[in-house]
């Protein structure tokens, strides 16, 4: 039912201003100086060539229509998926929570791991609506700001 998550992430970075990015059925904001890259299923914004920081939103079709009464069952699947992603990255899930994102019940995880010799945090948030899964990903170095990640999670809107 759930799409496999690819590596991506959220960053700390301080660009002047904000940029609103629109995808199919959603919008979100990024720091104004970040470069936006679009593919068929994903919009990603990166801080810069030498930074590990990035934010991304991917859309995946669900086999069945998500219904709120299925939340507890779906949450267990999401927990397993987050554990698998952490294992693939040789990291660990350091935080998990159910919260509201874009007016929908969502599941958020923080995964800590090493990437290119640096300690990073990757936040994944799964938002389900109808027959679509929205996967919000953000990555930043542990020693740097999580502001871009916070901006992604707080600005994400379904349209």
State where each predicted segment sits.
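N-terminal low-complexity, Pro/Thr/Ser-rich intrinsically disordered segments
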Residues: 15-24
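Extracytoplasmic/secreted envelope proteins and their assembly/folding machinery
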Residues: 31, 75-82, 149-153
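Proline-anchored loop/turn motifs at beta-strand termini and strand-loop-strand connectors
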Residues: 23-41
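Conserved polar/disulfide-associated segments of primarily extracytoplasmic proteins
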Residues: 37-134, 140-143
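Intrinsically disordered, low-complexity regions enriched in Ser/Pro/Gly/Gln/His and often acidic
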Residues: 3, 25-29, 64
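Surface-exposed amphipathic alpha-helical segments
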Residues: 34, 132-159
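Bacterial signal peptide processing site
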Residues: 10-13
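Sec-dependent bacterial lipoprotein signal peptides
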Residues: 1-8
């Amino acid at each position: 039912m759930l799409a496999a998550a690819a590596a991506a992430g959220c960053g700390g970075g301080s660009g002047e201003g904000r940029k609103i990015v629109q995808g199919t059925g959603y919008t979100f904001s990024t720091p104004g100086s970040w470069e936006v890259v679009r593919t068929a299923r994903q919009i990603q914004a990166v801080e810069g060539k030498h930074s590990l920081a990035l934010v991304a939103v991917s859309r995946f079709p669900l086999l069945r229509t998500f219904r709120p009464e299925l939340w507890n069952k779906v949450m267990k699947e999401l927990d397993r998926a987050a554990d698998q992603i952490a294992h693939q990255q040789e990291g660990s899930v350091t935080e998990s929570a159910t919260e509201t994102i874009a007016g929908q019940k969502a599941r958020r995880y923080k995964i800590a791991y090493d990437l290119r010799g640096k300690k990073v945090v990757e936040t994944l948030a799964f938002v389900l609506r109808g027959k679509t899964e929205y996967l919000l990903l953000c990555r930043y170095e542990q020693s740097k700001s999580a502001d871009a990640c916070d901006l992604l999670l707080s600005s994400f809107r379904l349209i």
